[in-house]
From Swiss-Prot:
The keyword Nucleotide-binding does not apply. Pfam families: Sel1. The lineage of its organism: Bacteria, Pseudomonadati, Campylobacterota, Epsilonproteobacteria, Campylobacterales. May hydrolyze 6-aminopenicillinic acid and 7-aminocephalosporanic acid (ACA) derivatives. Binds to penicillin. This is Putative beta-lactamase HcpD. It comes from Helicobacter pylori (strain J99 / ATCC 700824).
Length: 305
């Protein structure tokens, strides 16, 4: 399963990279570049027209861009049928993100009837095209036994491959499996290495997982200041647990001088990003502003529960 915001931003970043990468001067690629330029200007009408032309000229990334616009209603009326149509066309033209998007829609039932066999089919196609999102999604499905028989070995294999394809979310998941001994022998060194790689790839959860190892001194020398910096990085990458952990450290004075104002600010950030622990602490702050209750939620949290 790909979180909707994760999939959307991964698509946007990929498509922007495609725009600035070296492109052979074919007509389809020219239209794709013109579409991206129109999109930047907020000229959605021209963007759609140029993406359609590039798609009709067998530019898979152009079809995928159209699919994304129709799925999310970005500058056009949301139309799931059109999104599926263009994603399918993009996938057939060997664009791995189009395959991943179809897989996600069928796995989650987003605008289509939930269909695990179809989800697996499209994820496999995307993974075969060396798409990290698809390989990582297959890893999650095998780990959870979603639509397939639970198989930790396959989950680890697909997740490792996804990590090697620079999908940071899967690096964090591989680290989690080694840290928690899920289907493998516990190995904190391998966990640490994967968390580092994921954080380097700008996956916020990986930064939080790495920070947790430094805070607890698990296979590394305990370093609360380093932990705080990693939690801050996770927070800046929109990982709510990172914001929460920064708040806790400012509240308790771990890794930095105690600062209740900063603590409250980071609790608010964590809550805004959907981290329930931060929201619960804020409720307490609202009721007892002069006496912040220290409960079970007011502890640092590992990113993967």
């Amino acid at each position: 399963m790909i979180k909707s915001w994760t999939k959307k931003w991964f698509l946007i970043l990929f498509l922007m990279a495609s725009c600035f990468g070296h492109l052979v001067a074919t007509t389809g690629e020219k239209y794709f570049k013109m579409a991206n330029q129109a999109l930047k200007r907020g000229d959605y009408h021209r963007a759609v027209a140029f993406y359609k032309r590039s798609c009709n000229l067998r530019m898979g990334v152009g079809c995928t861009s159209l699919g994304s616009m129709y799925e999310y209603g970005d500058g056009v009326d949301q139309n799931i049928s059109k999104a599926v149509f263009y994603y399918r066309r993009g996938c057939n033209l060997r664009n791995h993100l189009a395959c991943a998007s179809l897989g996600s829609m069928y796995e989650d039932g987003d605008g289509v009837q939930k269909d695990f066999p179809k989800a697996i089919y499209y994820y496999r196609r995307g993974c075969h095209l060396k798409g990290g999102v698809s390989c990582g999604s297959l890893g999650f499905m095998y780990f959870n036994g979603t639509g397939v028989k639970q198989n930790y070995a396959k989950a680890l294999s697909f997740s490792k491959y996804a990590c090697s394809l620079n999908y940071g979310i899967s690096c964090n998941f591989v680290g989690y499996m080694y840290k928690s001994a899920k289907g493998v022998e516990k190995d904190l060194k391998k966990a640490l290495a994967n968390f580092k790689r994921g954080c380097h790839l700008k996956d916020g959860a990986s930064c939080v997982s790495l920070g947790y190892l430094y805070e607890a001194g698990m296979d590394v020398k305990q370093n609360e200041e380093q932990a705080l910096n990693l939690y801050k990085k996770g927070c800046s990458l929109k990982e709510g647990s990172g914001c929460h952990n920064v708040a806790v450290m400012y509240y308790t004075g771990k890794g930095a001088p105690k600062d209740l104002e900063k603590a409250t600010s980071y609790y608010k950030k964590g809550c805004a990003l959907g981290f329930s622990g931060s929201c619960k602490v804020l409720e307490v702050i609202g009721k007892e502003s002069d006496n912040l209750q220290d409960d079970a939620q007011n502890d640092t949290q590992d990113s993967v529960q």
